[in-house]
């Protein structure tokens, strides 16, 4: 038997993937032999029939011998120093020279990194965990690090080792982070982690911090460099940093990239360098089509949104997800933009182009739950690592998903850093946090006995609330001027109040009450609306309790609810008039705005995630006119500060009359911040026009009709006020003057006093 410096049981721990620190065995080690200081090099090389240690600087080779196992090699070299060695291996007829991963002993993660992560406060942990192309001791390669504290062994799998978990076993640190630098591989490598628990079960997992994944249904992570893109949005970011978004116009076009528009042909998309993108088929229901890439969407979607006049695009979740039918809300790759539409750099290009066209980007973010897919976060290291072990806290049975354990520091850090990551690396301008209520209440969609109370016996998830406060506090600290929007459907207090007041720290909250009230109201026969005037007026009773965003989202056009136009009563003309009336009132009402794709041209059918929108409708004049209506409405909204600068201040809104339920008419004033400018809004919610409808106004003069939702160019009957009206010296509604208006059927008027014309008429 050849001489060896290693015991059989130590070799077996390597061979059987049972060692938490293979660096103790493998690599180079100084030893004393026969009174001399020598070096021993050990390597476990499955599939190799022979191996040598190569010293390139000395141009020497040393044959290695096998010990205790046919593929465990050892070599003793009589030298006082040993560095920069390589291993030459023979596999079949092929020989290969490469650097030994176990020669790079110094960890990239510092003790301070690990300390911050363990206490949940490493805000840039994504720069440490995951896969990072780097250089160590003059050798390029990829550094891998993954948190799996309860695993017995973790290995890196990839094309570079033929997906053999024996070849690149990782080292476990004191905090449960496993790491390994693999030399001579680079960007574009596919990889996973092979995780073995103490029962011997093996799990193949995608990288929780992976920056890119394969297109579904494949699940490998891909090494990606996020620092190679050259951004051109410095001016946008600088302006954002010094702007209060709550005093700005915010009109959001909510879009699902996978169903907005498909490429008609499955031909691959061309990249700027002449290469082609991988083809990702959009749907089995539409086999001849493929998804547009991020770059193609930049050239199609951005001009479309810009033409319509929206200020922001909101993307349904673009983090990697395995199932198209989840719409992106069941995420497995929190740090990876979905590869359905291209690479991380392609998504950077999309955001950059949005900014260069003065369009902000909001991304839906899903920190409330995650799916059970085997390659994802579920049961990650053979234990309930990211989720609660008790299903009464750790599972949403209604959705078939798992709930994050917000009380665990590392899990909280994973999510907090993820929110920051999208702003840092992709320059996004806001997040909309999905299903906040499901996070805040322990009994959400759970029957009695299916949930556990908090330490005070209540149903509030205190850890989740603290987590949301931490996210929002850090977001606005690092990235002033961005948006954090809550989809919160209950009356949890102070959702959009700052954290220093005890609030959750969002700066906007979807107004779900307004949405339900208005959709119920507009679905009624107009004759019955007189009995439900409260649906229109109630929102102003609580409007100043939160910073509200009025949203008519994707949730309102699926699951048998019909699209917006299909909810409206009457014939086609009345349906379209109702749609115009609803959205004109929405844009005049205090609050920021969000509407889902397809509403702008009156799609009749529900949203179908498997197909693109019904673009052929734009061949027909009524749908062209509706699109024109939204273009002009956005233009007015953005140009008239009275409609947005005081959305969240009481002085920004005054009712003129909200009690005319007999005619189903409301009228009010919107005021501009720091000026005396205001607009007058009058809404007629029935098809009955009124040729002499009088309302009180605060100032004498000529009121220009800025907007009429019944204009002929929008498909209306063209009833109006011939461009404007002079006031009468006739007090009404506690105002000293009044206007005698013609109210169009199912119409909204927005008027503004023309001070120049008024001054000329008065001779001043």
Curated annotation (Swiss-Prot):
InterPro entries: A-amylase/branching_C, Branching_enzy, GlgB, GlgB_N, GlgB_N_E_set_prok, Glyco_hydro_13_cat_dom, Glyco_hydro_13_N, Glyco_hydro_b
Any Pfam family the entry gives: CBM_48
GO cellular component: cytosol
GO terms assigned for molecular function: 1,4-alpha-glucan branching enzyme activity; cation binding; hydrolase activity, hydrolyzing O-glycosyl compounds
UniProt keyword annotation of Translocase present: no
Gene3D superfamilies: Glycosidases, Golgi alpha-mannosidase II, Immunoglobulins
BP GO annotations: glycogen biosynthetic process
Alphabetically ordered keywords of this record: Carbohydrate metabolism, Glycogen biosynthesis, Glycogen metabolism, Glycosyltransferase, Transferase
Catalytic function, reaction form: Transfers a segment of a (1->4)-alpha-D-glucan chain to a primary hydroxy group in a similar glucan chain
Functional pathway: Glycan biosynthesis; glycogen biosynthesis
E.C. numbers: 2.4.1.18
Enzyme class: transferase
Annotated active site: 434 (nucleophile), 487 (proton donor)
Origin superkingdom: Bacteria
Family membership noted in the UniProt record: Belongs to the glycosyl hydrolase 13 family. GlgB subfamily.
Function as written in the Swiss-Prot or TrEMBL entry: Catalyzes the formation of the alpha-1,6-glucosidic linkages in glycogen by scission of a 1,4-alpha-linked oligosaccharide from growing alpha-1,4-glucan chains and the subsequent attachment of the oligosaccharide to the alpha-1,6 position.
Subunit organization: Monomer.
PANTHER family: 1,4-ALPHA-GLUCAN-BRANCHING ENZYME
Name of the protein in its database record: 1,4-alpha-glucan branching enzyme GlgB
Species this chain originates from: Trichormus variabilis (strain ATCC 29413 / PCC 7937)
Organism phylogeny: Bacteria, Bacillati, Cyanobacteriota, Cyanophyceae, Nostocales
Gene: glgB
